[in-house]
Amino acid sequence: MTQPSLNSLYSDHLRTLTARADEALQRGGFAHLVVPSGNTHYQLFDDRDYPYAVNPQFKAWLPLTRVPHSWLVYTPGKRPIVIFYQPFDYWHVVPDAPSGWWVEHCDIHIIRRPDEALALLPKQAERCAILGEAQSTLGAYVPNNPQPVLDYLEYQRAFKTAYELALLRIAQQLAVRGHRAAEAAFRAGQSEFGIHMAYCAAVGQDANELPYGNIIALNEHGAVLHYTELGQQPPQPLRSFLIDAGASAYGYASDITRTYAADPGSDFQALINAVDAAQLRMGQNVRAGVDYKQLHIDAHLALMGILKEFGVLTVSPEAALATGISAAFFPHGLGHLIGLQVHDVAGFAASDRGGRIQRPEGHPYLRLTRVLEPGMVVTIEPGVYFIDMLLDEVKKNGHAASVNWQRVEAFKPYGGIRIEDEVVCTDGNAENLTRPVFAAA
């Protein structure tokens, strides 16, 4: 996307953010919104910094992710002020001077020391809603994170602007580039570590830049939902590959999962194909007015139907759901909101004034319980796994006869399957952000 088009989209995005901030400040009774970018700080008993992570509330306003000790100040009716920390430092690379599509929309002040920000922040700290972590405290400017302000801003973050959708699309393109390289490395017999390195090289991002730790799981490791160990030697024989990996674009995240079989003629490949087709249908059901909780329950029924067809279950999908057996094979939620954060905020919010929509009973890991509305971007990530500790619970709970254990043993060496796309809820049909990028890659 060209800079002029991002310039126009950013201008509209900024109008949306200022309108939201106006309302949030009014609800909280504050005169100014003050957002620190966050600071670097040392690891315990060491002189090395933890990897820096920018405050999500800061990067909502600015496409800046590597500017610690900086600040965003917004006062209703005025242009946003950016206090940009650019130190004199010959030990490290300092941030480049502000440039890009956003600079003409803000008043920018360069500081060389963190405490120089004090002269540029609003005079009365008590009139400021300061959104940040405790380490960002500067003099009297202590992050207070007022709940009415956070409730409103975080609830509204579910509704993506056109600018945000553009950056999410860029993040998709970067991640798919990595996924294609990772699949090629798998087909070439690389180790998990080698596949991970191929992914990072293709995306052009290291572990600190990626939005989350890559899940690169070969064979049985696919049964560990968040497997991040990265084995140095490829297993023999090589059976399967599950990759859950994303990319970052100006502070916005992608989150994509694919599963591959080494043998395209195997039963496991057929099971992948069935889950993939079901996942595509689930994504098409992302529509305004649909309760995401129901999509999650429907996903359980669809996946258990597949396991019944493949001879893994001996009972109906409905019986598997009612008895909790389905949770042994599909133990996580269908998905979550995504945007500035991989698991974006306010997935349980009852309204922009707070409150919580509870998860369905028996589904403790679902991360989104809201009714879908236009502008929301969600992940759709059904999975089927063969996890010993969960399957043991099925036996302990007296449901051993509901499972064909011979079929389970046949699939266990492959670990599991997960397919994940990002989908936009619109006024009409769902827009899958992920599939077209794979098709074009």
From Swiss-Prot:
Cofactor binding, per record: Binds 2 manganese ions per subunit.
EC identifiers of the protein: 3.4.13.9
Cofactor(s) it depends on: Mn(2+)
Enzyme class name: hydrolase
Pfam assignment, any one: PepQ_N
List of residues binding Mn(2+) 1: D255, H336, E381, E420
Cross-referenced InterPro entries: Creatin/AminoP/Spt16_N, Creatinase/aminopeptidase-like, PepQ_N, Pept_M24, Peptidase_M24B_aminopep-P_CS, X-Pro_dipept-like, X_Pro_dipept
Catalytic activity: Xaa-L-Pro dipeptide + H2O = an L-alpha-amino acid + L-proline
Molecular-function GO terms, alphabetical: aminopeptidase activity; metal ion binding; metalloexopeptidase activity; phosphoric triester hydrolase activity; proline dipeptidase activity
Job description of the protein: Splits dipeptides with a prolyl residue in the C-terminal position.
Family as reported in the entry's similarity comment: Belongs to the peptidase M24B family. Bacterial-type prolidase subfamily.
Protein name: Xaa-Pro dipeptidase
Species assigned in the record: Xanthomonas oryzae pv. oryzae (strain KACC10331 / KXO85)
